[in-house]
Swiss-Prot record:
The lineage of its organism: Eukaryota, Amoebozoa, Evosea, Eumycetozoa, Dictyostelia. This is RING-box protein 1. Its main location: cytoplasm. It is found in: Cytoplasm; Nucleus. Belongs to the RING-box family. Pathway: Protein modification; protein ubiquitination. The RING-type zinc finger domain is essential for ubiquitin ligase activity. It coordinates an additional third zinc ion. InterPro entries: RING-box_E3_Ubiquitin_Ligase, Znf_RING, Znf_RING/FYVE/PHD, Znf_RING_H2. Component of the SCF (SKP1-CUL1-F-box protein) E3 ubiquitin ligase complex, which mediates the ubiquitination and subsequent proteasomal degradation of target proteins. Through the RING-type zinc finger, seems to recruit the E2 ubiquitination enzyme to the complex and brings it into close proximity to the substrate.
Length: 104
């Protein structure tokens, strides 16, 4: 009787409809900024700013982050911080500067 129950429960297991043999994942990544260079130091926005490059030998520099304004222009945080000490406007469009976000 135990043999009959074991075989009947095995037959109730649903058969696989398909099996994934290989998975090639693809990702798409886009910028939401128009310019990918910092207009202040001219380095690529994802590279270190000139201040962080100079401090790289001492290894005491903070993480070099990117800062976006509400005008959607992006600069290195260190670069725009130095700029804002003298002028409170975006270096590219001369609008009043407000941070939209900052980080990587």
């Amino acid at each position: 009787m135990a043999d009959v129950e074991a075989s009947s429960s095995a037959s109730k297991t649903p058969k696989k409809k398909f099996e994934v043999k290989r998975w090639n994942a693809v990702a798409l990544w886009i910028w939401d900024i128009v310019v990918d260079n910092c207009a202040i130091c001219r380095n690529h926005i994802m590279d270190l700013c000139i201040e962080c490059q100079a401090n790289q030998a001492s290894n005491t520099s903070e993480e070099c982050t990117v800062a976006w304004g509400i005008c959607n222009h992006a600069f290195h945080f260190h670069c725009i911080s130095r700029w804002l000490k003298s002028r409170q406007v975006c270096p590219l469009d001369n609008r009043d500067w407000e941070f939209q976000k900052y980080g990587r």
